[in-house]
Every structure is written in C-alpha cells, then in structure tokens.
C-alpha cells in the first residue's frame, strides 16, 4: 500500500516507486501521467492494472468535514492507524464511500493498495484501417477478456485525439477550426 495526498500524479508515483526500487504497478488510467491518483480514486475511476477499480483499492482515507473537524476511519481513531491502512473494512459501519463523487468533505489523504509488477508485461498495438472494423474488433476483445482472465490485463481503445489528449496540452484557440475542433 502507499499513502498519497492531493496532487500526487500517476507519473510522480511511478518515479517514486522506480527510484526506491519498489516492484509495484501504478494504478494508471487512460488520462496519462498527470492524472491525480487521489482524484481518480474518489471519482471511482478505473484502469488497466490488476486493481482496475481504483476506489476499490483504497484501504483508508482522511478528510476534513464542513465544520472543520477531521474524519478518520474507526480503526484510525482507535489508535491503530497502521491497521487502518491495511484493512479497508475496519470496524463498525463503512462510510468511506460517502466521500466519493460527493461534497461531504475534502479528502486530504488516501491509502491505496498497489499490485505487484508481473514478471513480464507485453503490449499489443493494432490499427483498424476502417471504422467498419471497430464492431468486430470490440466483439473479439470481449471474447479475449473472458477467455484470458488474469492474463489479459486490460484493453484500451484510443484514436489519435485520445493519444494527443494524454500527451500534449490542449491546443490554443488559434489552432482550432470554427467549430472549436482540431483540424484533421
């Protein structure tokens, strides 16, 4: 598990894990390396690592409530903060989910479980030369995902606009056409 605060991005966590020799995977999304780990988890984001449900991988959180008081899980409040980091369900009612997609508090910290890096990772890229091939490709992808659970970690379909959004800032207004779109 790793504990992060607002502003820690996928890229920052990847650098930290690499620099410290930790063989764990970053819970990545299709949003790219500048995406916030905490924000994505609170929005119930998902990704292509074994812990694909990012909020599902959150084991503990800390938040500031509207009256200025702090929310911590029951295990945390009982003086067992380390246990709270490791045991998601704690004791008593589970209320951490109230802080997802809501305004019940400002989450200042989450602890999230990371999956170990596999012995090997392979990436397969393919191109569909025609839009007509998308539907049969999606059907085949569904088939592969159901036949290879645990082996095939995830599929991420992207077009050039998606790749551009992940790797470059949004273009200035002067670079867009009259409809506000990027020219081909």
Predicted segment positions?
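Phosphate/diphosphate-binding loops
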Residues: 58, 182-184
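Glycine-rich N-terminal segment of FAD-binding domains in flavoprotein oxidoreductases
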Residues: 1
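Flexible, glycine/charged-enriched surface loops at secondary-structure junctions
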Residues: 24-28, 135-138, 144-165
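Short glycine/threonine-rich loop-to-helix capping motif typified by GTGT followed
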Residues: 162-181
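FAD-binding subdomain of flavoenzyme oxidoreductases
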Residues: 6, 11-141
